[in-house]
Amino acid sequence: RITLTNIKDNKNTHNIDFHSVTGQGGGASALTVLPGETKTIEIRLLYPGTFMYHCAFGDVPEHIAHGMYGMFIVDPEKPLPEVDHEWAIMQSEWYLDELTSDRVNKLDHIALLNEEPNIITFNGKKNALLNENSLSMNTGERSRIYFVNQGLSLASNFHPIGSHWDLVYPEGATHSTNNTIHGSQSTLVVAGGGTVVELVARVPSYIILVDHALTRAFYKGAMGIINVSGEENKEIFEAKVT
């Protein structure tokens, strides 16, 4: 059961399209709510995986560009194997114009139309997974990342610098009959799509998570850090001093 309330102080009509839901508009039609309204749907989730949800009323690109989206994880009937860490990461695009008097950015409609975001983030803002917000794990541990590319326009080239995706569930589809990939360097995640990836911390290092269209990482913000602590493993990596 999903219930959506649009508080009475809002000025606009909204709804939610759940990519995990089978039904008109992913539930959006039945969940369209005017300010002050509440609506409910009853659903059965047919497929496990990592899904996007977003507002799908009116100017849908503009609503997504304003951050009206999220991640919806559906566990498979047979649970995935236990891991040491599980993290959820969303990639987002921001099409921002000048600040208003109340220091809120306006939406740049021309940049949105041309699919040219000036900021691309992990988990909603620059540095959300950097510095004191970095992720951490120890050598020998395995981490699972549930990843959704909210778009709304660009595909993501999700890559761990200094490591590999030990296991990939392509497109985030975790049904037990689906094939997985072992030892991938990067995995492609389309706009509005997802993936589930796992990595193993084999040596102490900083694993840098990026969209490997690297201007997005180094200039626009799509970057995160996993801080790996523990004992060195010289059979895997050793820096020689000359």
Regions found by a protein language model. Give the residues of each.
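Copper-binding active sites and cupredoxin-like electron-transfer domains
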Residues: 1-242
